[in-house]
């Protein structure tokens, strides 16, 4: 295969995974990555922990730029914004100049951007998003220069809860405002969110079913106005969701899928020849339903980049799709899921049965055991496990086990007879996941 030119737009997880994979398989190829910020291979999921003060901002880059440039031979351009895409070339604004670069293969890995509500005051000093590493730097610097006691977070998703924990841990008075009637409404059923909300109310002012009308202040933010009240604010975090950055792809005529993200096939190819997409900008299929979904999560993004890079370099491999496996926490309460919730399964047309159990993470006689709640969703016709949600303590092994089981097509009987490890310091003899399968019946 002759030497090719590969251009990758975006130097985050998906982009650098794609670039690294191409260079590993085709070290003689010219691989260029254009990243609009000065951060490469960054970890946005770490932003709350930088703000909390338990992680240094420098660690938000998995590898420094020198690793990709010197060790992997990638032509990495930082602070380089791609402003135009045409067949065979991209136009880049870099160091105050514009320059064109040719490509034989193109990868869109330019991620997603925060959805900012159209309300007055979002541009006031002291109002932030928590989407990229520069946001973590800006928030911490603002707190160092200004007295911050009252923090308002607009949103009730993962980022909102994680940022809330960061500020609560730092001793701030936190108000969490959401338009919906439940936190985490899109990803968890009510049995789970009821427990989460009870925990939140122990540590902050939770305001649900309130629409934010404006953010007000003179020289900087001072308060947030909703249709239900007025809340003092020295700092505001807007965490109302994200949207895929598809504008550049549209310039090239790339198909945008029904989810609003770039359509891709199993090889991460788009509708345009030799053009790929990976990460938060791309949609994929759901492992259970086979339908198109946009679930922007880091593990899948990395794998999408790996698959795109492999196929570009001639090593065919397919991305099988996602389950939406995810986990977060608020203080000492862990929250996670994999597969379909009951609400999602019913919307997809499944006849389901469910079970919701409370268990302990260790035998009653062994110290250190804590409560865990699990909800299982099963196809009533086939007994196939469709989804598991968990809240409480030590949920990770249960969620990860369930993800593997769902991927493999396990029924409740298969789950029940899975030979899980047991010893009193680690788990009860009847693991909560096995108990869940028993209650779901087979």
UniProtKB/Swiss-Prot annotation:
Its cofactor is FAD. Its main location: cytoplasm. Catalyzes the CoA-dependent reduction of elemental sulfur (S(0)) to produce hydrogen sulfide. Can use both NADPH and NADH, but shows a preference for NADPH. May enable S(0) to be used, via sulfide, for iron-sulfur cluster synthesis by SipA. Also shows coenzyme A disulfide reductase (CoADR) activity with both NADH and NADPH. However, CoADR specific activity is about 20-fold lower than the sulfur reduction assay and CoADR activity appears to be an artifactual side reaction and is not thought to have any physiological relevance. Also shows NAD(P)H oxidase activity with both NADH and NADPH. The active site is at residue 45. FAD binds at residues 13-14, 35-36, 42-44, 82, 280, 298, 422. InterPro entries: CoA_disulphide_reductase, FAD-bd_OxRdtase, FAD/NAD-bd_sf, FAD/NAD-binding_dom, FAD/NAD-linked_Rdtase_dimer_sf, Pyr_nucl-diS_OxRdtase_dimer. Gene3D superfamilies: FAD/NAD(P)-binding domain. This is NAD(P)H sulfur oxidoreductase (CoA-dependent). Binds 1 FAD per subunit. Optimum pH is 6.5 for sulfide production. Keywords: Cytoplasm, FAD, Flavoprotein, NAD, NADP, Oxidoreductase, Redox-active center. Homodimer. GO terms for cellular component: cytoplasm. It is found in: Cytoplasm.
């Amino acid at each position: 295969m002759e030497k090719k030119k590969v251009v990758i737009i975006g130097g985050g997880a998906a982009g650098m995974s794609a670039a690294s994979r191409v260079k590993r398989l085709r070290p003689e190829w010219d691989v260029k990555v254009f990243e609009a910020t000065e951060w490469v291979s960054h970890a946005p999921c770490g932003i709350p922990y930088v703000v909390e003060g338990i992680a240094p901002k420098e660690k938000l880059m998995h590898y420094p730029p020198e690793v990709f440039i010197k060790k992997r031979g990638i032509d990495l351009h930082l602070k380089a914004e791609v402003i135009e895409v045409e067949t065979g070339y991209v136009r880049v604004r870099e160091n105050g100049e514009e320059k064109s670069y040719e490509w034989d293969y193109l990868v869109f890995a330019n991620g997603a951007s925060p959805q900012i509500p159209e309300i007055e005051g979002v541009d006031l000093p002291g109002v932030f998003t928590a989407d990229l590493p520069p946001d973590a730097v800006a928030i911490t610097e603002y707190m160092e220069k200004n007295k911050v006691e009252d923090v308002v977070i607009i949103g009730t998703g993962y980022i909102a809860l994680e940022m809330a924990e960061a500020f609560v841990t730092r001793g701030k008075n936190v108000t969490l405002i959401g338009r919906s009637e439940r936190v985490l409404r899109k990803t968890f059923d009510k049995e789970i969110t009821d427990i989460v909300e009870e925990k939140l109310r122990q540590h902050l002012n939770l305001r649900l079913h309130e629409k934010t009308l404006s953010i007000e202040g003179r020289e900087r933010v001072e308060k947030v106005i909703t249709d239900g009240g007025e809340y003092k604010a020295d700092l505001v975090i807007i965490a109302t969701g994200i949207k895929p950055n598809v504008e550049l792809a549209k310039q090239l005529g790339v198909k945008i899928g029904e989810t609003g993200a770039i359509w891709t096939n199993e090889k991460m190819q788009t509708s345009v020849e030799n053009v790929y997409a990976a990460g938060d900008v791309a949609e994929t299929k759901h492992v259970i339903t086979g339908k198109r979904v946009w679930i922007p999560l880091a593990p899948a993004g990395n794998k999408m980049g790996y698959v795109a890079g492999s196929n570009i370099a001639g090593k065919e491999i397919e991305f099988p799709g996602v389950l939406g496996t995810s986990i977060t926490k608020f203080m000492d309460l862990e929250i996670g899921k994999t597969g379909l919730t009951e609400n999602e399964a019913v919307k997809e047309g499944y006849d389901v049965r469910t079970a919701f159990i409370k268990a302990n993470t260790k035998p009653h006689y062994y110290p250190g055991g804590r409560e865990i709640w699990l909800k299982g969703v099963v196809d009533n016709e086939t007994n196939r496990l469709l989804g598991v949600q968990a809240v409480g303590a030590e949920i990770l092994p249960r969620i990860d086990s369930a993800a593997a089981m769902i991927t493999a097509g396990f029924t409740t009987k298969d789950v029940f007879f899975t030979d899980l490890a047991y010893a009193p310091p680690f788990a009860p003899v009847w693991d909560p996941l096995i108990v869940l399968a028993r209650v779901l019946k087979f």
